């Protein structure tokens, strides 16, 4: 019985690979179904014999309660965008300034959802979304229902891989036809369909929708020496990789590839929105490193956005949390990149003047970065007697005089008590990436502000249940729920609070770097500008913005009020002692460890102050080598780098 189940699992997985990955089925659907039904019957009779890679794991459904947060062991960085050949050439110049010999690999930018897959001893244990790059959602059960995601690997390896989950065009058409027949709203594009499917609580729906994947990165430490070798390894392990890539010696080569792909884009069976160009050599990648947000060794070229004509009907002016006044055009509705667009940004007053945009003009509209509708230019042939657009002289929120500084393109309201600015700051403070106060959205902020209950972020922590009950729409249950969410946020780590304060130029990544280094906001508030600027990935702009903010009397008062409200001001992540054994050292793990899992070894090294890198370079201080260590060990020996074994690591 056990042997027959094993045979069926093996042959059905092979048939599935032929069908889904190779598009070369060797048996009919009827033959597959017969074998599949036999396996189901045997597993039903003998559930103790069900194998982890059985294809029956992929079908059928169960209802999930929700998705838990998942902290990525290896962070997922976003990529710097490029929209022209000139921007690609600038990227190339930055790379070749340090590494004249660098070559590139060009891969298609799949328009889907970024995923991370983690395997232990060859078995899939976690499948997660990208989230903010540090924390995503655990969607393992749903990813198990994606036909080409391997449940087990041919080797008992510990590995974390990255890729894109997408909905092929054929699946998208089929799903939308079914939804149309059922009287349900159709998905606007394959990316939205894939995202919505992966967040389904009914796993059976995921199994039916025909999602697919392309894997492209080994996130855990790799024995490969190049990105092209990584793709070969992923292929060998049974992952689906995209073979539409090219190796390029120069930016001329990459541009040739981009132009050829652009011509074939509509004929591909899946949606793409660009081409990713990476330095192929992993050691050079390691040397180039990262900025706060993105790797310095890669860039994502985005194809020109779809453009449509629309008429500007009117213009709204709104004030953001930094006081910038932004114009937004109300348009005659147009279909653009799968959605109906009736509003588009006009950026700023300088842009309006430069393009001579007027109400009543017919303009070209596109989606900047395929996301934000924007006005590109005026269609001059339709210009009649439209008057020059009136530019506001007073803030649309508080009626204060607006400023237009010489070194800025935007109008700015500098009134520190401008209602729109204050409300926007409160919304930002409560947002998911900041203090994550569930239920405190824009409409509730507006009610709180209008009732005079809050004016700054410290006031949020002075709210009582009775205060909330005075607001329209609040009952005992909803008031208690929001109150508890506010109290819970007090225990967040300090990087959430720092980001929530909305200091100019200080994003979530920079916030974490800062509080990790200085330990708490009170220490950071008195930090020297040069000490801040010297931190990797930051610089003078962020440092000056921080020191200017904390030097103000208002900021000191705000910190005091937050502390009095018992809001945590301290970094709660792991703090490494500057005198730790490996403090400041770059360490590479290679080979197979006998007694420790690779993740455990990485965590221990980091706890000892090390920066664990994925490849050996001149910056590497130490290599920890297990058995069967390959090219990394050889390179370390050639460079004269100190080499230690697993026993040494255990002894620390």
UniProtKB/Swiss-Prot annotation:
Positions bound to Zn(2+): 395, 398, 413, 418
- As recorded in UniProt, its EC number(s) are 6.5.1.2
Q: Where is the BRCT domain?
A: 577-652
Which residues are involved in binding NAD(+)? 29-33, 78-79, 107, 130, 164, 278, 302
| A single GO molecular function term of this UniProt record | DNA binding
**First-tier enzyme category under EC:** ligase
Keyword list, A-Z = DNA damage, DNA repair, DNA replication, Ligase, Magnesium, Manganese, Metal-binding, NAD, Zinc
Q: Which domain of life is it from?
A: Bacteria
Record field: transmembrane: none
Give the matching HAMAP family. Answer: DNA_ligase_A
Identify which cofactors the protein needs according to its UniProt entry: Mg(2+); Mn(2+)
Q: Could you tell me what reaction this enzyme catalyses?
A: NAD(+) + (deoxyribonucleotide)n-3'-hydroxyl + 5'-phospho-(deoxyribonucleotide)m = (deoxyribonucleotide)n+m + AMP + beta-nicotinamide D-nucleotide
User: What does the record give as the active site?
Assistant: 109
Q: Which BP terms from GO are recorded?
A: DNA repair; DNA replication
GO CC terms in record:
cytosol
Question: Which InterPro entries is this protein grouped with?
Answer: BRCT_dom, BRCT_dom_sf, DisA/LigA_HHH, DNA_ligase, DNA_ligase_AS, DNA_ligase_CS, DNAligase_adenylation, DNAligase_N
**Per its database record, what is this protein's job?**
DNA ligase that catalyzes the formation of phosphodiester linkages between 5'-phosphoryl and 3'-hydroxyl groups in double-stranded DNA using NAD as a coenzyme and as the energy source for the reaction. It is essential for DNA replication and repair of damaged DNA.
Please report which protein family the annotation says this sequence is part of: Belongs to the NAD-dependent DNA ligase family. LigA subfamily.
Protein name (database record)? DNA ligase
Name the encoding gene, please.
Answer: ligA
């Amino acid at each position: 019985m056990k042997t027959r189940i094993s045979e069926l699992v093996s042959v059905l997985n092979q048939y599935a690979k032929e069908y889904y990955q190779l598009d070369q089925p060797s048996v009919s659907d009827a033959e597959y179904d017969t074998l599949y039904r036999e396996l189901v019957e045997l597993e039903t009779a003998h559930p103790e014999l069900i194998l982890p890679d059985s294809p029956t794991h992929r079908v059928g459904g169960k209802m999930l309660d929700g998705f838990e947060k998942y902290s990525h062991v290896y962070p997922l960085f976003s990529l710097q965008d490029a929209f022209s050949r000139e921007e690609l050439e600038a990227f190339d110049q930055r790379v070749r300034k340090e590494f004249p010999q660098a070559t590139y690999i060009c891969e298609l930018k799949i328009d889907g959802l970024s995923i991370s897959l983690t395997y232990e001893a060859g078995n899939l244990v976690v499948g997660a979304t990208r989230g903010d790059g540090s924390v995503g959602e655990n969607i393992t059960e749903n990813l198990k229902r994606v036909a080409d995601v391997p449940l087990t690997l041919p080797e008992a390896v510990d590995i974390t891989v990255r890729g894109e989950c997408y909905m092929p065009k054929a699946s998208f058409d089929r799903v939308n036809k079914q939804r149309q027949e059922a009287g349900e709203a159709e998905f606007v594009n394959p990316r939205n369909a894939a995202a919505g499917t992966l967040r389904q609580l009914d796993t059976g729906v995921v199994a039916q929708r025909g999602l697919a994947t392309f894997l492209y990165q080994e996130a855990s430490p790799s024995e490969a020496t190049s990105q092209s070798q990584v793709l070969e390894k992923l292929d060998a392990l049974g992952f689906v990789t995209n073979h539409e890539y090219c190796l390029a010696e120069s930016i001329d080569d990459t541009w040739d590839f981009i132009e050829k792909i652009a011509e074939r884009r509509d004929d591909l069976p899946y949606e793409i929105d660009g081409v990713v160009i990476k330095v192929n050599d992993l050691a050079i990648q390691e040397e180039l490193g990262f900025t706060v947000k993105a790797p310095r060794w890669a860039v994502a070229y985005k194809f020109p956005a779809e453009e449509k004509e629309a008429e500007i009907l009117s213009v709204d002016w709104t004030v953001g949390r930094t006081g910038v006044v932004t114009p937004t055009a109300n348009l005659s509705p147009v279909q653009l990149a799968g959605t109906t667009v009736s509003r588009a940004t006009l950026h700023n007053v300088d842009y309006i003047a430069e393009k001579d945009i007027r109400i009543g003009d017919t303009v070209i509209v596109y989606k900047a970065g395929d996301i934000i509708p924007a006005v590109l230019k005026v269609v001059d042939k339709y210009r009649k007697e439209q008057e020059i657009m009136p530019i506001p002289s007073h803030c649309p929120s508080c009626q204060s005089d607006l400023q237009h500084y010489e070194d800025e393109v935007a109008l700015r309201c500098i009134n520190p008590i401008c209602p729109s600015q204050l409300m926007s700051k409160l919304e930002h403070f409560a947002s998911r990436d900041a203090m994550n106060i569930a239920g405190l959205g824009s409409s509730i902020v507006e009610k709180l502000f209008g009732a005079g209950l809050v004016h700054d972020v410290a006031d949020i922590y002075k709210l009582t249940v009775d205060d909330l009950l005075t607001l329209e729409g609040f009952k005992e249950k909803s008031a208690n729920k929001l109150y508890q969410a506010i109290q819970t946020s007090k225990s967040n780590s300090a990087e959430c609070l720092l980001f929530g304060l909305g200091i100019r130029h200080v994003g979530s990544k920079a916030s974490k770097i800062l509080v990790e280094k200085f330990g708490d906001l009170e220490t950071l508030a008195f930090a020297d500008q040069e000490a801040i600027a010297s931190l990797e990935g930051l610089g003078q702009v962020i440092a000056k913005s921080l020191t200017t903010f904390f030097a103000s009397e208002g900021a000191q008062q705000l910190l005091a009020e937050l502390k009095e409200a018992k809001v945590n001001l301290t970094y709660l992540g792991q703090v490494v002692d500057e005198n730790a054994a490996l403090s400041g050292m770059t360490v590479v793990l290679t080979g197979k460890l006998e007694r420790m899992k690779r993740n455990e070894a990485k965590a221990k090294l980091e706890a000892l102050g090390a920066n664990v890198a994925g490849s050996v370079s001149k910056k590497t201080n130490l290599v920890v080598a297990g058995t069967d260590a390959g090219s990394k060990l050889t390179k370390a020996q050639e460079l004269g780098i100190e080499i230690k074994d697993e026993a040494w690591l255990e002894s620390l």
